[in-house]
Amino acid sequence: MARVTQYQSNFTVGEIDPLLLGRIDIQQYASALEKAQNVVVLPQGGFERRPGLRFMLDISSHLGGSFTTLDGIRLIPFEFSTTQSYMLVFVKNTTSNTRMFVFANGQQITNINGSGNDYLVCALGDIDLDRMYFTQSADTLILVHEDMSPKSIVRGGSNSTWTFSTISLTSPKHAFTLSTSNPSATITPDAVDGTVNITASSSVFTSSHVDQYINVLNGFGRARIVEHTSGTEVKVVTEFPFFEKDVAIASGAWELETGYEDVFSSTRGFPRTCTFHEGRLFFGGSKSLPNSLFGSKIGDFFKFKAHEALDDDALFVTIATDSVNAITAMRSGRDLQIFTTDAEFFVPQADLDPITPSNLVIKNATRRGSKEGIKPVSAEGGTLFIQREGKALREFLFSDVDLNYQANNISLLSSHLLKSPRSMALRVATSTDDGDLLLITNDTDGTMGAFSILRSQNVVAPSEFVTDGKFLDVAVDITDIYVVTERTINSATKRYVEMFDDQRTTDANIQYFSGATSPDQSLPSNTTCSNLSHLEAKTVDVVRDNFVLTDKTVSSGAITIDEAPSSFVEVGLPYTVEVKTLPAEPKLSSGVVVSRKRRILEASPVLDRTQNIAINGFEVPLETLPYTMGSVPTTFTGRKRVAPLLGYSDTAQLTFTQTQPLFATVLGVEYKLSTGQ
């Protein structure tokens, strides 16, 4: 019987796919976990209890009865300035109108536009909000959907002043039903190129011919009609110059091309995606032309109709490949990046030249395809996107070696945490020793995948967030992470807006303290904590003045605690923390121990500011002597020994849990292992 001492110094691989449990040969095994539930893996190596969720708003009554949570709710961040940013919550109320709620600095903005309502009515029409795409420039948010004419939302002079309007676009033209005719007349141009007046020998032109084309068959010349003067005279702009001026082109030697109509219309649909890039507003795809790219005139964001193909003119190009390539997303980065259902593209810019009609080229980079409805996010020079089938998280990153983009699978070790992803958001690192936190909600079971990312140290550490109910949507306002949850409250289905709070340890919680603003409450002067109707009939955790009280059940929107609080009370739903190490596989001279019985004799976790932690069901004593009865929980930093741990097993694993809603951080763990024959 062999005894060895093992030390797991970090957990920076996070929770790995069950399919990898047999891969004791890979380097990542030593830093991985079998389960990481409701914890955040730190880029320094440890893990900590995830933040609690602060209750913000019940939006259940605003969601129209016929709409599902999948198409009727949407979170969109909006950054107005370097000091002012917002979270906008869109809730579909009727087939015509959507209500927009505004949050700033963790508080709801009320009395929008002095209307007495705490929401702005937005006439978005009967669209699926989860397919609505957005971008912004300064004080204006642009919203697009293939079944909705583009909209704008503008913040006015204060937090509560907002304007919703339909954008008036100058649409490009496309021949959806091209037809040609040969009018019985000669035509004579008065110039060779540029803006040209054309005179016909008989009345052949009508006002409907504006934006249609004259094409010379025998010779040179192609021009777009821009103005109808009379039946015998039109003004055109040449695409190809005429051979000579003031010389009649014979009847039958030219044709009139018709069938060109607005690309963006109620008949042909509207843009699918949008982004700003190098002074232009780009639309990626439309309902009828899903694989086309449209760029506005520089500095004139809503003008998409080309004129003379000058460098600042509008752009219109179609991705022509051997597959459909409907555009699902775009991002302005090193280049203009274009994500489609079948592949990833970019617009190269040689020598950093700006994009113009004459040099516009779309290059294919990779062929993975991205999932529609999930907007890619920027992270450390790359772009993270969900692959088309929703089974992989990929990083679209330019390689200086290959001089091309790559789409590496960064969820290879943890693809089981992606279960029909619905939304994705990134909270960028907030300090020099912090990492980015990528959050992905799953439709299948309402869980949330959480990926701690620090690419400079090759850290991609996933864990899983679960709550009493489902996570429906997630978005980030600078550092504040908002979610929409679905919970069953008193036998009714509710949808709440909530926000992660590092200082709280329960879900859908409110706190009572001096100076609180709604939905938090002022500190009660007695033992009754009220205004808890959003948790009616639920069993809740209660923390009073850092003491954890016995569980309470909310009745008539209130609970009764043991004594009046002196500083604060937190009341919220409990959530389970569970972290399980992989089976211990020491490297012995006799070989592997996969088939042997094993026992962990003792464990010594390294803790940081921890108030409660248990290992294999044994609560770790954190108090130090002399101990005072009735004192608040100890906040411990250091190493604690837990022994003896009883029982042989086939795996020999450590399971970290918590018995109370308190803070916990584990930096590493040493354990002594005994192996049988």
Give the label of every model feature segment:
Residues 244-265, 554-592, 657-676:
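Surface-exposed interaction regions enriched in Ser/Thr/Asp/Glu
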Residues 1-112, 152-156, 161-193, 253-331, ...:
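N-terminal beta-propeller domains
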Residues 123-133, 562, 628-653, 657-661, ...:
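Beta-sandwich interaction modules
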